[in-house]
């Protein structure tokens, strides 16, 4: 994993953006664009003693020993990629871990176990000093605790800790109390804080929590926010840490800026917003960060850039429909850009998934590809069309491309799509056996050939040659891969609906 990460860092245009511009940005005067005037908002400061300014805007996840948040970094660009010795030919199962099963009936159905959308596992390679500390302090370790650990939230309402090598429990599970749909986030400052968001209220209290791995205890719980502009208190977004702050988004339509230590978490400030003339909507996608700016999309299609220091909107873009896929930030020749696309939800049975590339600093549209999609009938329900998968940037022999899964694009199933990042044009699309919400991950050979693994909702895993879209191998590997995988070495770890977390080898 380290070898390919070094290649990506060297080959990326990110090398052009040295520390000085980031520092200048952090100290720049507050600025907003006319598009931000479309947003009605309030900012509430809860802690006036702690300065709101950022002292460092580097991406803390770039040097984290593993994959600590959804899509790896605060840019959500998934630079953590697998390594292959040669062109791969197949996928095989290494181990399967069984979760509990939650049979409670909720107002939103029964959720069972395993993992759902987005449900990406985290991965950590513990430094020796923290291995020793945890062996001394933690009451939750098992005999299988080791240096390489997988952490995943389950629809059963539990958080599981798994030894990467053996697939056995590395710690006692943590009972969160309600189904967890989204992706957890581990603090890259290595203070042991694990940020957990509950997704479905099977019981009360319902909300978000912080669990500390060193003490193996819950240190904070945040329940329903009575002042929120939306009365749905789920926390599917994966929090992100910037400097000394934790940024947590909620489906209640609020951005929370927190300060967190090993023993306590406090709200520093918060921002509530809505499009003028509209009701408030929530966020299921995870926030991205570049410099001192926070980026995200919501359930009606608002794409916002917010100043992290002030929590005031900088710019707004209307993408016209529910946008559940997480935005991706990319540093390219000519600037910093944001990629996003929408679902087909509010439009009716058919419409467009609007895949857009925006100037991340101004919100100006670079290009838009209106991809015709439709809702899909499955299990007597209409499933939304469009994009739920978070896009993957191409590197190596696929530099200049971006990949994603689309639902209902020209068929009742799903499509794996490659798009040219310069023009927005579809380079190719390959039909999958069914629709896919899972986000693709990349693996590279020594000569920088890119291969992709992605899953669909009937349990297929696809091994794809990224340059051509050729599907090399398909494995029926689970019940339903809504969850996104994490890639480690030449393997992936991914959960499925039901009761399973799997490790697969790409060979």
PLM region descriptions:
Residues 1-12:
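Bacterial N-terminal signal peptides that target proteins for export
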Residues 11-21:
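Bacterial N-terminal signal peptides
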Residues 22-28:
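Signal peptide processing junction and immediate N-terminal pro/mature segment
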Residues 67, 116-154, 158, 179-208, ...:
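Repeat-blade elements of multi-bladed beta-propeller folds
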Residues 76, 157-160:
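Terminal-region recognition feature
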Residues 418-430, 436-437, 441:
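C-terminal structural cap/anchor segments
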